[in-house]
Each structure stands twice: as C-alpha cells, then as structure tokens.
Amino acid sequence: MAKEAYKREKPHVNIGTIGHVDHGKTTLTAAITTVLAKKGMAQLREFGDIDKAPEERERGITISTAHVEYETDKRHYAHIDCPGHADYIKNMITGAAQMDGAILVVAGTDGPMPQTREHILLARQVNVPALVVFLNKVDIADPELIELVELELRELLSEYEFPGDDIPIIKGSALKALDGDPESEAAIMELMDAVDSYIPEPVRDVDKPFLMPIEDVFSISGRGTVGTGRIESGVIKIGEEVEIVGIKPTRKSVVTGIEMFQKTLDQGQAGDNAGILFRGVDKEELERGMVIAKPGTITPHTKFKAEVYILKKEEGGRHTPFFNNYRPQFYFRTTDVTGAVTLPEGVEMVMPGDNLSVEVELIVPIAMDENLRFAIREGGRTVGAGTVTQIIE
C-alpha cells in the first residue's frame, strides 16, 4: 500500500516515552512504528535508528532527542524518545519537545525504579496533562510480581497527584512485538487505543487567549507606536482592547493596526510574526520583554517557584557550584531580568548537572503563569533552564 500524503484531517498530539533506563522506552518506540507500519500508518523505524538520536539546541542547551511520527485511526502523533536520562530532564524542563501526554514505560521485572519516580515527578512539575503506562517485559516476569508492580505503580502515580486508580496500564512485551509475536502486537494496539482515548486532545495555540511577547518597538510618525514579535497564542483583530503587561505597571490600549511583511491585515494569529500598532502609547512606554495580551489573562509577577536544570561544565555551563542568593539573569521569552535564587532548606550549594526546585525573586515584574519556561544566563551565556511551577507574588 502506497503511503498517503500527510493530510491535516486528524488532530495532532505530541507524546513521548518516559521511564527508567533500560526499561524499554526506545524498544517500545520502535515496536509502535513496526506494528503501525504494517497497517500503513507509520514509517518503520529501527531501534538503532531511534537510539542514535540527533542533538538539538533549545534555549542554548544541547539535547539528544529522536522524533518519530505515526498515526492511529483517530489521530496523528509526533513521538519523542530520548537516549539519556539527562536528556529527558533537559527536554522536560526546557519544553524543547512539548508533551501533551506521555507513555510511562516500566519493566515488569523491576517495577518502579529511581528514574521512574523522577520522571513522574518531572511530568507533574512541568504539567504533562496525562500519562498512560506500558508495563513491559511481562513475558519474562513472574505473574504475581506483575500484580504487585501494578499496585505499586498506581500508588506512586497517586503520590504525585496523577489519577493512579484510573490510569490505563497496558501489559506487554515491546521486544516480542518487534519480532512479530501476534499477542504482543495486540498489546501495542491496545496501548495505542489507550493513548487515543486517555490522553486529551490539546487546545491549539490559536484557541488560547491572545499573547504576543514584544521583541522590538518603533514609532511611525503620525500613526503611533508599533510593537513587533511573534504571536505566541490566540488571535488579534483591529479595534480589540489589549493589556501591556510586565516590567512597568500594566496598562490598556486598543489595537489600531496589524502588519505582517509590510502588508496590513485585519487580524493576526498564533505563529505570525507581526507588528501591532497601539492607540495612545508612547514609544517610551513599550519595551522588549513586555507582552501584549487579552485583558485579564496574564499578570506580572516577581516571585515564583521553579524546577531548574543546571548545565554541566561539559555542556558549556558553570565550572563551579553556586550558593544561596545566587544572582544570574533569567531569560523570559525575549528578555533577561536579574533575579535572586533561594535554595531549598538543607541544600547548601548547587553543582553543575543538578536538577532541583528553587525560589526566585526578580528585580522587575514579568508577565508569567505556571509552566512558563526560561533560561538562566550569566552575561549572555546559558547556564541552566527552568519552568515556573508556582507563582508566589
């Protein structure tokens, strides 16, 4: 059967495999493409091909990630798989590969291991909306042990505020599915059905409230002030009221013009690089780092909690640890803002390569909500990355 050209008829969902090292994440990824390829819904990807994941850079951090795509009857999926544990942490914290849901792979022979717990915690911290579990290697695990592992997993998921009692747990063998064993192939299809039905369809960026970070500001004589940037979410139309949020006190304005590539438009939407003209705003009142947003949808803050990853020396990060009250720059969307870091109780210092929760206080307020990603920089050099997990004030 000839592969059909990819048509945008099915909803698109981003997922990934997470879990402890050697529990079978990459084997499962290969098995999914193998089983779906037989139905003409994926291109076959070999284990070795997925395992040699290319390196990518996101917010100045190098991450190895393999991207695989496939479809089911209901959806089109982009699936990510990371070779190393550190790659997962970096991926989840930088949001390099945004996950609408994840497949947690746990070996029935081992049960939950340290990285299983760590990945569940991270998924909670960075708000991965839903998890589905694949209990792997059940062909070589003791059936009584499998029952215990399942109970233990449900407790662990509940501990991190996932609905442990309701999460689908599919049992199978990724390796046997790769070898074409019919029963194991059926388990892969069962897993895909669970992913289809249990992982919610994401809200598209266009359907979210309007937000555009300002990258540049200039004035057009006789017409007013223009802010340019890439529209992050939503839709904006001429005549609509917006709020200008961050750095200075929040103020309202009305959009009097929208331009893209020198052409005037009546509306702009998520993904567009646009110039927006504002009524009654002076050039001095707008600056890079502010955001233009639908009124009442986002507020400016200076204090927040965050989950951060600090780069290793080999990754171009710091060579030395840092201590309480460390003051780097935090790069949010389009600008750097200095802030002070408060370490959790009992933590004396942070070493390059560490991943932990911290509290940050910025010197000026920035428009933020939970899940906002940022880079940690020192003089323009990236030394870490983070995700806002809770706003304090």
Swiss-Prot record:
GTP binds at residues 19-26, 81-85, 136-139. Mg(2+) binds at residue 26. This is Elongation factor Tu. Residues 60-64 are annotated as: G2. It catalyses: GTP + H2O = GDP + phosphate + H(+). The keyword Transcription does not apply. GTP hydrolase that promotes the GTP-dependent binding of aminoacyl-tRNA to the A-site of ribosomes during protein biosynthesis. GO terms for cellular component: cytosol. Disulfide bonds: none annotated. The lineage of its organism: Bacteria, Pseudomonadati, Chlorobiota, Chlorobiia, Chlorobiales. It comes from Prosthecochloris aestuarii (strain DSM 271 / SK 413). The gene is tuf. Residues 10-203 form the tr-type G domain.
